[in-house]
Amino acid sequence: MRRGNGNFVFSGGFLSGTHFRAPNSVPATLSEKVYAGFKRDIVHGVFQPGESLSEKDLARRYGASRTPVREAAVRLQKDRLLRIVPNRGYFVAQITLQVLNDIYEFRTAVECASAELAAVKGASSQVIKELGNLAQVSCRPDDRGGCVRFIEADTAFHLGIASLTRNQMLYQAVNDARSQMERIMLAAIDIHYFGEVPKREHLDILCAIKDRDPERAHQTMHDHIMQSKDKVLGIAVVVPAHFARG
């Protein structure tokens, strides 16, 4: 595991070039930089759900003309992170109960299959060690920076498992869901402890993969995702201000 630009990066699997190579993490064009910055600001809560955003202000913020901002907005609408309302502007997408259910159903289908296939294909001791290091990262709810690092490590762990499948489509499917998942976790983590329990669950998943036990890998990933879903949906009911109905 290494860190670059403040982010955890899993260096095994796709990212090492052993199987498939992940998309370049460094945006190459101004349009990509605007998209990456805009997306990060939504995911990390700089822009709040439902907030109205001015194209002019966004162009100033990202040091670009309005054209790259428009291009980024179209992509973010496809990512379900932004709404474009004709003649009104841009609005940060709400995190609705429907979004929560959709993302967890998607993760259950895709990531359980990913863990199962990873156990079938196996991993080197170095990769297992690296994923184990990612699984050890935890945070306290009063440490915002630590929580962000925990969520980055969580993303790297799940992408690392997906990379072990040596299946580009599975990897991309897991990757596509992570922006929504990071956003959900950041919205929930302020009022719920996300530290030790996910660590134990991650280590259980990893142990099943190390033991080449696909059935157990599938089940432990399923249990992990369901535990996360129960926590977040519980928060959505108790503290509805964090999530919108719909």
Give each language-model segment a name.
Residues 2-4, 191-246:
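C-terminal regulatory/effector modules of DNA-binding transcriptional regulators
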Residues 29, 129, 193-196:
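Short helix-capping and inter-helix turn/linker motifs at the boundaries of alpha-helical repeat units
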Residues 78, 82-83, 177-179, 194-196:
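Mobile beta-alpha loop/short-helix "lid" or hinge segments that flank ligand
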Residues 103, 107, 120-187, 199-208, ...:
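Conserved amphipathic alpha-helical segments that form helical-bundle/coiled-coil interaction surfaces
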